């Protein structure tokens, strides 16, 4: 029963991630990466990404509604 609950929460998290545009692996697109002829100092600061866990990202994007609180509580025990 616990496994079914975890699967349901993960499915919901995946659906929410798709809606809010969170990349599950939090990777930076190749276009923003420097190549051999571009040192890091030429990249704008905005291109630096911070890696957070999926759980943190979901909780941070939740609205303060009952549905959001329920999902956030469900995600919290997984992470």
From Swiss-Prot:
How does the UniProt record describe the way this protein sits in the membrane? Lipid-anchor; GPI-anchor
Query: Where are the annotated glycans?
Result: 25, 30, 35, 40
Question: Which residues are annotated with the lipid modification GPI-anchor amidated glycine?
Answer: 55
Q: Listed GO cellular component terms?
A: cell periphery; fungal-type vacuole; plasma membrane; side of membrane
The UniProt keyword set, sorted, is: Cell membrane, Glycoprotein, GPI-anchor, Lipoprotein, Membrane, Signal
Where, subcellularly, is it found?
Answer: Cell membrane
The UniProt annotation puts the region (Disordered) at 24-44
Which residues, if any, are the signal sequence?
1-18
Q: List the disulfide bonds.
A: none
Origin superkingdom: Eukaryota
Cite the propeptide residues by number.
56-79
Please state what the protein is called.
Uncharacterized protein YCL048W-A
- The organism is Saccharomyces cerevisiae (strain ATCC 204508 / S288c) (Baker's yeast)
């Amino acid at each position: 029963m616990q496994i079914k609950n975890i699967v349901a929460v993960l499915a919901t998290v995946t659906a929410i991630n798709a809606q809010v545009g969170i990349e599950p692996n939090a990777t930076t697109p190749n276009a923003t990466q420097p190549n051999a002829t571009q040192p890091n100092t030429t990249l704008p600061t905005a291109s630096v990404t911070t890696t957070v866990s999926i759980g943190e990202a979901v909780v941070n994007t939740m609205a303060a509604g009952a549905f959001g609180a329920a999902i956030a509580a469900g995600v919290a025990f997984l992470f």
